[in-house]
């Protein structure tokens, strides 16, 4: 069985599969993904595979430069998105946006 290339919290699985979540915001440890990469996606909690995505774009962002567009791509409000990012990556400022589509 192949390992997963990237994981998401299980609570995001349905939004990813339905196309409501089309970006992920990660820290430097996951800044290596490039446009065109095809990734196996698993759940963070159990590493269970649930889809394959293609990276369509990458960019950098800070908490202060997050926009309503980012929030919409995450299927959240901007305050929700800022809180989620701050909770997952406390004390960090620089992040990497990975835009994707399900294959």
From Swiss-Prot:
Pfam families: ASCH (PF04266). Catalyzes the hydrolysis of N(4)-acetylcytidine (ac4C). The keyword Hydrolase applies. This is N(4)-acetylcytidine amidohydrolase. It is an enzyme of class 3 (hydrolase). InterPro entries: AC4CH (IPR008314), ASCH_domain (IPR007374), PUA-like_sf (IPR015947). It comes from the Bacteria. PANTHER family: UCP029143 FAMILY PROTEIN (PTHR38088:SF2). It catalyses: N(4)-acetylcytidine + H2O = cytidine + acetate + H(+); N(4)-acetyl-2'-deoxycytidine + H2O = 2'-deoxycytidine + acetate + H(+); N(4)-acetylcytosine + H2O = cytosine + acetate + H(+). GO terms for molecular function: hydrolase activity, acting on carbon-nitrogen (but not peptide) bonds, in linear amidines; N4-acetylcytidine amidohydrolase activity. Belongs to the N(4)-acetylcytidine amidohydrolase family. The active site is at residues 21, 24, 74. One of its GO terms (cellular component) is cytosol. Residues 6-101 form the ASCH domain. Its EC number is 3.5.1.135. The keyword Hydrolase applies. Gene3D superfamilies: Hypothetical protein (2.30.130.30). Keywords: Hydrolase. The lineage of its organism: Bacteria, Pseudomonadati, Pseudomonadota, Gammaproteobacteria, Enterobacterales.
């Amino acid at each position: 069985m192949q390992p997963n290339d990237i994981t998401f919290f299980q609570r995001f699985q349905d939004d990813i599969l339905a196309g409501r979540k089309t970006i992920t915001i990660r820290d430097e440890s996951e800044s290596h993904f490039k446009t065109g990469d095809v990734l196996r996606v698993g759940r963070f909690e159990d590493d269970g595979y649930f889809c394959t995505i293609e990276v369509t774009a990458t960019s950098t962002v800070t908490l202060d430069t997050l926009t309503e567009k980012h929030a919409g791509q995450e299927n959240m409000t901007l305050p929700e998105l800022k809180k989620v990012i701050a909770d997952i990556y406390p004390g960090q400022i620089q992040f990497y946006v990975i835009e994707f589509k399900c294959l």
